[in-house]
């Protein structure tokens, strides 16, 4: 699914081009980073628009099976001037003990559905509390921050919890200057799944090699995914 995940997040970055255009640097924090599809998408977006601001990336994931892929990504980043780190830790415990300063892009992709699927959805409120107090509030005063939530367009498993991000930011008097919902229209959505406006993209924006398609039965059609982009100052 890396091709589709990268496509989804590239669409999110493109939606936020005007907001990101004058960033003096990009300090990306990815919660539940996996194979870092969000960084792949960002690097493509960055090159497409000829950005020159420095990039740093911190990924957090509990699953060390991603390590071989992350190690290859590290080598690529070292050769291309990207400061890249991955920490293998439980996201939901990590920020009770650690503060991250000056982050200005936060990506949370398929983390809510992971909580639901593993019967941990009850921790979402405390997770959001830690996210806001130990990460979002630690940005520089007046600094722009983009929060991207990308998840399953399904009741309870994804979009149901998006509004909690907004309420938690408002609780701590952070200013949300823009709130954007986007979804991928698979042609068979219920009205309740059509929140915001659809992306025009229907298929992977990246060519999937035939060998990978055969070996992994890789699909190129976009899935039922919904996104919330929050511009915060």
Residue ranges with predicted function:
Residues 66, 77-78, 88-233:
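Domain-level detector for long C-terminal conserved domains
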Residues 14, 46-50, 74-77, 119:
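Active-site catalytic pocket residues across diverse enzymes, especially alpha/beta-hydrolases
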Residues 53-55, 78-85:
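A short helix-to-beta-strand connector/capping loop
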Residues 1-20:
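Class I SAM-dependent methyltransferase Rossmann-like catalytic core
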Residues 56-61:
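Conserved SAM-binding motif I beta-strand of class I
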Residues 35-52:
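Conserved SAM-binding loop of SAM-dependent methyltransferases across substrates and taxa
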Residues 24-34:
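Conserved class I S-adenosyl-L-methionine
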Residues 70-71:
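Conserved SAM-binding loop
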């Amino acid at each position: 699914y890396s091709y589709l995940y990268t496509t989804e997040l590239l669409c999110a970055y493109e939606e936020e081009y005007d907001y990101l255009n004058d960033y003096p640097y990009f300090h990306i924090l990815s919660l539940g980073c996996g194979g870092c599809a969000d960084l792949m998408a960002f690097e493509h977006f960055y090159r497409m628009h000829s950005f020159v601001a420095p990039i740093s990336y911190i990924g957090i994931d509990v699953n060390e099976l991603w390590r071989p892929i992350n190690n290859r990504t590290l080598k690529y980043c070292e050769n291309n001037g990207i400061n890249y780190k991955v920490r293998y830790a439980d996201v939901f415990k990590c920020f009770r003990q650690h503060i991250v300063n000056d982050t200005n892009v936060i990506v949370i992709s398929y983390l809510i559905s992971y909580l639901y699927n593993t019967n941990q959805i009850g921790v979402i409120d405390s997770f959001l509390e830690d996210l806001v107090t130990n990460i979002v509030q630690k940005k520089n005063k007046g600094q722009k921050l983009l929060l991207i939530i990308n998840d399953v367009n399904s009741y309870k498993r994804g979009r149901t919890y998006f509004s909690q991000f907004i309420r938690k930011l408002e609780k701590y008097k952070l200013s949300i200057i823009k709130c954007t919902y986007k979804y991928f229209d698979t042609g068979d959505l219920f009205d309740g799944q059509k929140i915001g406006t659809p992306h025009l993209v229907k298929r992977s924006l990246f060519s999937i090699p035939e060998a990978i398609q055969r070996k992994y039965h890789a699909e190129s059609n976009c899935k039922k995914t919904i996104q919330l982009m929050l511009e915060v100052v």
